[in-house]
Structure formats: C-alpha cells, structure tokens
A protein has these predicted regions:
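Conserved pre-ATP/AMP-binding loop-to-beta segment of ANL
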Residues: 1-12, 19, 42-48
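Conserved AMP-binding A3 loop
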Residues: 8-32
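Short beta-strand->loop structural element characteristic of the AMP-binding/adenylate-forming
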Residues: 21-24, 51, 73-80, 147
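Active-site glycine-centered loops adjacent to acidic/histidine catalytic or metal-binding residues
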Residues: 127, 151, 173, 231, ...
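Conserved ATP-binding/catalytic segment of the ANL
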Residues: 189-194, 198-257
C-alpha cells in the first residue's frame, strides 16, 4: 500500500543555473497542497475550472488538475491557450488559472469585455511575475482583481494573495497554511523586516529531494529543515512576500545589487 511519504511524481526543474533536476514529490506533498488550495481559494461544488495551462509544470499538471479532482468539480481543459476559445468558454466557467501573458492577450481581444467577466469568481495567475500595470489594467478592464500566487517545482504552491482581503500588485501574498517562510542571508540568518534575502520554506508541500542527487539535495536544505529556494524576496511585518529576483541572476555593481 502507498503512504503519504511514498513518491508520487518526479518533475524536472527548468535548470536555470545548471542541468535540470528531478524533484521527487510525495503523495502527501501533492494532496496537502491541493486540499489547502481548495479551502484557501474557496472552491465549491458550484465551480467550473477553465484550464488552458501546459501540463509540463506544477501549475498545470498538479495545481489546476488536483484542485478540480479533489473537490469533484468539472474542468474544461484546452490543449493550448487561445484567446478566442477562452472567450467562448468563459460564460460556462467560474474560475480560470493562467499566466500573466494569458491575461494581457485577453485584454487585447475585442470580445473580452467587462460584461463577459461579471459571473467569474476568480482569476488566478502564477508561473511568472504579474506586473503591477497588468494587475491594474485587468481590474480597470474587467472589475476583477487577479489573485497572484507563488510556487515552484520543489513545493508546488507556497504563497498566495488572499481570496478575501486586499490583493497588492507585485506581491505573492502570504505563506499557505502549514507552510513556514523566512527570508535569510547567506549564513541562513533571518534578515530584518523589509530587507532582501533568499526565501526559505518548510512545510508538508516541500519535496523529498532530487532524484539520484543526494549531495545536491543536502546542499539545498538548512540544518533545521528549510528548503533554500534561490529566490530573492522581501517580507513585510504582516508576512506578505514580494519576489524580487533569483539569487544567482543578480548583477553586482559597486557592491550593490
């Protein structure tokens, strides 16, 4: 019999700073994440999900599919994003998961009107930073505020703007329930509120390690069990997170980044 700690999937990272690595995600990692999101994003039996994401990363393969499956709601799956087809489907769905370019392309379509969106409960964005101007333009266009969230291959979803409450452009919101986030310096010391450092995380969503790479796995975790994301971030006094870049992609000039 399979248990929560048994490996359910190996999903390969994008390999931003080297060769791609196979992140081992357990049944517990995936189920805990989906159940948390179903509650956090308020899914009910009345929802219908529109899914036009590619299924080679966690957003499309796990987050969207698992939320629909575990809540038992219909999902309209499109093999690829097409503005005209999304517009045709919108009248029969209540939730859409997308990436920022989906929303900019929709706003360019003449048939994507404010009236078309009035029944929509939620537009979710992730997988790439949502520009503040896109957030504001979409609200002006539709009257709906996109909910931005943050995740990665090694932990699926990690943080989210609130369903109820203020969604601030340029931020990814707060740690998911059960997930602990901290922003640290190179010695893994927590930085002061508002200062930039590397985002670290611990929780039931965090993967079991990299496939056949024990040394790499060990180097990516702190002694107290936090995964070192490699993403540079800030956190305010309320715990709201802003992603500002990648650790290894920073350009240092005159000692400043």
């Amino acid at each position: 019999d399979l248990g929560a700690d048994d490996i359910a999937s190996i999903i390969y990272t994008s390999g931003t700073t080297g060769r791609s690595k196979g992140a081992m995600l357990s049944h517990g990692n995936l189920s805990s994440n989906a159940l948390t999101l179903i509650d956090l994003w308020g899914f009910t039996e009345n929802d219908v999900l529109l899914h036009a994401l590619p299924i080679y990363h966690v957003h499309g393969l796990y987050v969207a599919v698992h939320c629909a499956m575990l809540r038992g709601i219909p999902m309209r799956f499109l093999p690829r994003f097409d503005s005209d087809e999304v517009i045709r489907q919108l009248s029969s769905v209540t939730v859409m998961m997308g990436v920022p370019t989906f929303y900019t392309r929709l706003m360019d379509a003449p048939k994507f009107t404010r009236d078309l969106c009035q029944h929509m409960r939620l537009f979710i964005s992730g997988s790439a930073p949502l520009l503040a101007q896109t957030f504001e333009a979409f609200f002006a266009h539709t009257g709906r505020r996109i909910l931005e969230r943050y995740g990665m291959s090694e932990a699926s979803m990690i943080a989210s703007n609130p369903l109820e409450g203020e969604r601030i452009a340029g931020t990814v919101g707060f740690a998911l329930p059960g997930v602990t986030l901290r922003v640290c310096d190179a010695e893994h010391r927590t930085v002061a509120t508002g200062e930039t450092g590397v985002l670290q995380m611990r929780g039931p969503n965090v993967f079991k390690g990299y496939w056949q790479m024990p040394e790499k796995t060990a180097s990516e975790f702190t002694d107290d069990g936090f995964f070192i994301s490699g993403d540079m971030a800030t956190m305010d006094a309320q715990g709201r997170v802003r992603i500002v870049g990648r650790e290894k992609d920073l350009v240092i000039s005159g000692g400043l980044n």
